[in-house]
Amino acid sequence: MHFDQRTQSALREVGLSMDEIRAASDHVVAATEDAATDLETFFEGRETVYSDMDQAHSASEIQEHAVEYLDLYTHADDIRGYLRFDSWGVPVEAGRVITENEVIELTLGPTVQDRVRFASDPDQL
């Protein structure tokens, strides 16, 4: 079950049955899995993507990246994984689709430690 005990209790207090709470939990899990699939699909078949990532030795606001892969897994409402660029990689701690098949946002872990938007076209950032 996705919801912790406090949340389950609150949902019961507003009148939801355990079956309804389980159904809601299942919907959260399915939505998370769909989001992870959409995020991975964004990078598939693209040789180059653009981002608003803050990089130490770049004066540009928009960065260009060659991405080898995005590998994600889900647990309840968490999306985690690894984003591999051509010469380095970074853990992924969360993500969401902003504009379907055009702009996504990933929360990147150590070495970046920031939310970064990626787009198929630099003008979309």
PLM-predicted stretches and their roles:
Residues 1-56:
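N-terminal interaction modules that seed assembly of large macromolecular complexes
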Residues 1-3, 8, 70-75, 95, ...:
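Short, well-ordered helical secondary-structure segments
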Residues 11, 16, 21, 25, ...:
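Generic hydrophobic secondary-structure signal
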Residues 41-97:
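Long, charge-patterned amphipathic interaction tracts in eukaryotic proteins
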Residues 77-125:
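Amphipathic alpha-helical binding modules
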